Amino acid sequence: MQNKPIPFHISNVNHGLAEVQGLIHIKKNHLILEFEIKDALGGFIKSDLKEIDIPFDEIESLTYKKGLWGASVKIEGNSMRTFEQIPESEQGRCELKIKRKDRNEAEKSISSARVALSEYKLNKLEE
């Protein structure tokens, strides 16, 4: 499964002093979150690029919600460790915001990722 990467952001990191900008890559049996943290004041100070591989085994659910100004992708993991490296994640869940201009492409990609996740879980049950 090769979908176009989905741009995302997480605002109000470190009490509004930083924000996360990144891409969601949807692969056959896993998601890859690639991101960097920037200061919110000018974006001049950046962290190193981080990449987190999340196997479908560690994902409980994947949802997409369209809003008036954008959308959000919510990923729920099987463990708190699944998203421990992602800022603002808590209790094994993370929410990634999608800008309005990217939401239609994101909706298609997340829909196909949900199908792939369901098929993966069904195949695991049959084993």
Label each region the model flagged:
Residues 1-5, 11-23, 44-127:
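Acidic, Ser/Thr- and proline-rich intrinsically disordered linker/docking segments
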Residues 20-36:
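Polybasic phosphoinositide-binding surfaces of eukaryotic membrane-targeting domains
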Residues 36-38, 59:
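Histidine- and/or cysteine-centered catalytic micro-motif in compact active-site loops
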